[in-house]
Amino acid sequence: MNMFLLLMSLYLLGSARGTSGQSDESSGSIDHQTSVQQLSGEFFSLENPSDAEALYETASGLNTLSEHGSSEHGSREHTVAEHTPGEHAESEHASGEPAATGHAEGEHTVGEQPSGEQPSGEHLSGEQSLGEHASGEQPSDEQLSGEHASGEQPSGEHASGEQPSGEQPSGEHASGEQSLGEHALSEKPSGEQPSGAPISSISTGTILNCYTCAYMNDQGRCLRGEGTCITQNSQQCMLKKIFEGGKLQFMVQGCENMCPSMNLFSHGTRMQIICCRNQSFCNKI
C-alpha cells in the first residue's frame, strides 16, 4: 500500500512536470530519480510499523504538496515557464524541502525576477530613448550640414555671379586697350603726315617743267606725244632709250617717280633709263 502511494505521488509529480517542456522533463526526471532513491532508502531502512505510518504520512504530505505545487505550477506556467532558477527552486521543493520555504523562495524568486527585469527593461527603454535621441540628433546635424551646404551653395552662386562682373572689367579693359590701339593707329598716320610734309616741301622747291615725248627718233626729234609735265613731290624728269640690235630705235621722256638710272636687257632689247635732275630736257645726243 505504501509503495502504491509512493508510485502515485511520483506519477502525479511526473505528469505535472511533463507540461513544462523537454528541458523541464530532463531536470524533473533527475529530481524524481533522486527523490525515489531517497524515499526507497528511507522505506527499506524502516522496520517498525510506527516508522511505516510516519512514512505513509510523509508520502501523503508529499502527495498533497505535489498536488499543491502542480496547481501552483499550472497557474504560473505563463509567468515562470522560461525562468530556469524558479523551476529549479520548485524541483528542490518537490525533492523533499518544506513546501512553505520552497513556495516562499519560488515567490521570492519570481517576485524578484520581474522587479529585476523591470529596471533592466527600463534601462533598455532608456537606452532606446537615448538611441532615438541620438538618432534624432543625427538628422538634425545632417540637416544643419545640409543647410550649411545649401548655405554655401548660394555663396558659390554668388561667386559665380561675381565672376561675370569680374570678367566685365576685363572686357572693358580689352575694349579700352582696343580703343587705345585705335587711338595709336589714328595717331600714327598723323605722325606720318608731318614726315611727308618736309618731302613735299623739299620737292615743291624744285618744281620743273619736264619735256615729254611719246616717240623720239635717234636725232632727238619728237615724232609723237610732244608736251610738258610738272614734277611733283618726288618726281623727276626721266628719259628712256630703247636699243634693238645695238641700234637706237626710239626714246621716251616724261615725269616719273623715284627715277633710277639703270640698264635693262630683255631678249636682245636693251632699255637705258636716264634721270635728269633739275633739267627739263634729258636728251643729249
UniProtKB/Swiss-Prot annotation:
It holds the Pfam family UPAR_LY6. Residues 85-184 are annotated as: 7 X 5 AA repeats of S-G-E-H-[AL]. InterPro entries: Acrosomal_SP-10-like (IPR052671), LY6_UPA_recep-like (IPR016054). This is Acrosomal protein SP-10. Residues 69-95 have a biased composition (Basic and acidic residues). Residues 66-95 are annotated as: 3 X 5 AA repeats of S-E-H-[GA]-A. GO terms for cellular component: acrosomal vesicle. It comes from the Eukaryota. It is found in: Cytoplasmic vesicle, Secretory vesicle, Acrosome. Residues 64-200 are annotated as: Disordered. Sequence repeats lie at residues 66-70, 71-75, 85-89, 91-95, 110-114, 115-119, 120-124, 125-129, 130-134, 135-139, 145-149, 150-154, 155-159, 160-164, 165-169, 170-174, 175-179, 180-184, 190-194. The gene is ACRV1. Glycans are attached at residue 278. Testis. Residues 110-194 are annotated as: 9 X 5 AA repeats of [SV]-G-E-Q-[PSA]. Keywords: Cytoplasmic vesicle, Glycoprotein, Repeat, Signal.
